[in-house]
Amino acid sequence: MDFVRVPASLIHANRLNEKRVLIYCSLLLTTYGEKVCSVRELTSSCGFSLDRHESGAMRQVIQIISDLSDEWITTEWTDRQTFSYRIKPFRYYGIIHRTEYEAILDRQRNLKHARRRFNHSSILLVLAYVRSHMDSRTEQPHTYYATLKTISAETGLSVRCISSAISELENMKILRVEELPHFKDGNNQWHTAVRIFANYYTFSHGFKRPNKWKLEIERTINNIKSTANKSTGG
């Protein structure tokens, strides 16, 4: 499996733990096709330490699996530590590629040894959220724009956490993000500043290729300003 389609309804389920996308991706990318999944192995594959807080981390994973079972997967427990599962159907989603998932998990493990905080669960959630909103129509730029407050309200993450996740995704060259400052339309009406997201790379048949993100962002800015002027009669 080269990528995971994360259900949009799961991404927006802000009542659930922020680790929901991490565990969903880990479940599919590390255990898909196996008859039985081990909670211990899943916990480890998510990047959680099993040395000092094994029982706490595993209990949290079990709880999130239980939450996922409400709407997104069906589970059958063999015993308290192993289960089999099937994915429930869905229509809308955000894609996370295996190479992106592995790069984020590798960075989390490396920075943990350096005692630097790196919230990989929120980073995956923000990435899945942005991807779920990107316009896939060929005639439109494949971008998404929103305020940090909007993303916070829809994911359940704090603005500070989202801002940190965005910085990491930029540093890793997964997303390119530009801020469109407050602007005044032709009717002298001010519009709120937004962040514009574009993919740093595109994927085709498993191969990663550079994306024309600068052009995509410029087209998006023009579309935003054009729409604002039309709505005010400018």
Predicted region positions:
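Electropositive, intrinsically flexible nucleic-acid-contacting patches
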Residues: 1-234
